[in-house]
Amino acid sequence: LLSRRVDLLLLKSLRAKVCAYLLSEAEAHHSLTFTIPYSRIQLADYLNCDRSALSRELSLMQRDGLLETYKSSFKLLEPDALRHMVL
């Protein structure tokens, strides 16, 4: 768990951090639709960013058709595109 967080924090962009986190959660849940155990504030803290920046990035990703989100629930619509953003 700690090494996963360190790997996330080494990524440069917030979008890459969000993509890596959501892809790892999808893998852990064996589904592209899942609920995370964090609020937006807790997730922002986990990713070491401001809550407002996280909310803005998630809104942009939703607008771009990459995912759907409501509170702590997510549906990854374009997992291959998300994987590409982590590289």
Predicted regions and their residues:
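Short acidic/polar alpha-helix capping motifs at helix-coil junctions
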Residues: R5-D7, Y21, Y46
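Phosphate-/nucleic-acid-contacting segments
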Residues: E25-L87
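Pre-recognition alpha-helix immediately N-terminal to the DNA-recognition helix
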Residues: K17-S24
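A small-molecule sensor/coupling module
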Residues: L1-A16
